[in-house]
Amino acid sequence: MKLYRHLAWDGIRKNSRLYVPYLLTGVGAVSFFYILVALARLPEGTLPGSGSVQVILNLGSFVLWVFSLLLLFYTHSFLIRRRNREFALYNVLGMGKGDISRILCWESLLSGGLSLLGGLALGVVLSKLAELGLMRVMGLEADMTYRVSAGGLLMALGLYGAIYLLILLSALLRVRRSTAIQLMRSEAVGEKPPRANWALALLGVLLLGAAYYLAVSIREPLTALTWFFAAVLMVIAATYLLFISGSVTLCRLLQRNPRFYYRKRHFVSVSSLVYRMKRNGAGLASICILGTMVLVMLSSTTCLYFGAEDSPRTRYPRAENVTVWYTDREDLYRDHSDLHAAVVTAARSRGAQMQDLREYRSSSSALTVRNGVLQGAGGSISDAVQFTAIPLSDYNAAMGARLTLSPGQVYICHGRSDYRESTLSFPGGAAWQVKGLVDNLASGGDSASVVTQLTAIVPDEEIADMDRLMEGMNTGVSRSWSCGFDLGQEPARDEGDPVAAAIREALVSRQDDIRFNVESLSENRGDFYGSYGSLFFLGILLSVGFSLAAVLIIYYKQISEGYEDQARFDIMQKVGMTRRDIRSSINSQLLLVFFLPLLLAGLHLVFAFPFVHKLLLLFNLWNTRLLVGTTAASFLAFAVLYTLVYRATSTAYYHIVSDGGDR
């Protein structure tokens, strides 16, 4: 046993250039996972909106675990490939596959144990710092109680222990299926130079074009949400196809150019690239996808966090927002004065200074509209609207306007997508002429709705007719009285809202058969900060993780290719190639392909921008200028990191191929 343990430890030590990043990856993944689980298990009431925060953090921990599974398998494949010659020598010297398997078991036990123990220790140490950071981004006072989550420790130990067990089983299976000769040759075996596959390249272009078209053509946020994940899958598939097939085609074209190819700075780099391009293309595509994930996630969550005050203000334009629903339209129009008096009396009983009060009655129904004709259920989701009819007198009173309408005319309120038809019709021939577009007064606003709002201002004497037409659609009609007003001074975030509480008490005391909802800006602001703060925190954490994964892939890619190119450059030096020529050739190779993932990730980000903007509308965030700023800043920061990694890995590659490495 001591022999196997010694050989395993000696193998890790001698291959520290490859094992140290692998161990650090495991430590980082385990610590990040524990931190997310520990934060999700904080005592109830520690964070605002704790229900949504817990869901977000649990989802983030699941995403991190799945990503860790893929990344650790990917990086371990480099280790095994590098160790195959060593295992073959053990086999030639008399060790059987069982002995090699025992060495692998000890290596997995040592590397997995170090990663698990180091990750859990680091996670426990940093979890309090992460908790303080999360509370900071939510604008809360710090709680200095130190907690260790036993459930988080057990979950991290179990799930990541399972990953290392799967990695071990995969390595053992590979050894069992290989012969000593195969193991000896496997390190030197590169990819066969594939032929340029124009069909796959064309498929990649078509998929990417289709995804980009979806991104720029979809207008409605709900439609964008429906198609978002399909577009993501199309972009991922297209990126892999283009890098694998397109890069081969590029190298073949370069080889056909004698002026470029037969220069000593290009000859070695291009010929080695085309020899390994299938694997190289997949690695570059992975880097591009990870970079795009980082850019989209970082820009969107940062925009949400810094726009956290805009969102509740969009969702709740007034400090207090009251909605009362009636089943019967006649009851609504009879009782609205009493409702107004009840709300005003309740608010003033708490010393409220009511400002900018707006109230109106409405009838609303979920319909579809196409070419100016309203229809019931069954239409396309892109045609879905929440149609609302408001009496002209209510609109004028709420907005301080003096609009007039003749019979058969309506105004349409401005919305997310302005209504462009000249008429508004119902099945059966009933139609109204659109006199013009006016400002929206709905207390929730069009921006607060998942589907598009279509609000019509109707003559008072015709509101009953339109209500009956809506009822005939058989989709249900919601009849309500809405009231919103601001306060002279809003309550503090942690003090509750006595005005909202008084209004609820007043409405509960009524004997009417009504439903009501009282929404307070001050009461709900904490939920916004909780949700957006946790999303921002999770976005930062996962962005760091994905960025480190991209760095790790780049590092292993460069190191492994450096070892493979070592013999080629050694031959070139023997026939007269200088170190300066080697450096020039390396720069040519790296510059040729290294920045392609960054450029394509930037292109993906540009076309993803409309998609992200539409999705942020579902979070009540309309600040396009802020999103542009966070997107540009995210790309700039990632580009700087990418360039630094390029310089570091090119230096490591150069030392391996020029100095003989550490074979």
Question: What would you call each of these model-derived segments?
Answer:
Residues 1-6, 177-191, 563-564, 654-663:
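Short cytosolic juxtamembrane segments of multi-pass membrane proteins
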Residues 1-30, 193-198, 207, 242-291, ...:
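N-terminal Sec/SRP start-transfer signal
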Residues 17-45, 52-88, 108-122, 236, ...:
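Hydrophobic alpha-helical transmembrane segments of multi-pass inner-membrane transport and secretion
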Residues 19-23, 58, 153-158, 198-202, ...:
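Hydrophobic alpha-helical transmembrane segments
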Residues 38-50, 120-152, 209-226, 597-660:
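Short helix-loop junctions at transmembrane helix boundaries
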Residues 110-254:
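Hydrophobic alpha-helical segments
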Residues 311-548:
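Basic-flanked hydrophobic alpha-helices used for secretion and membrane insertion
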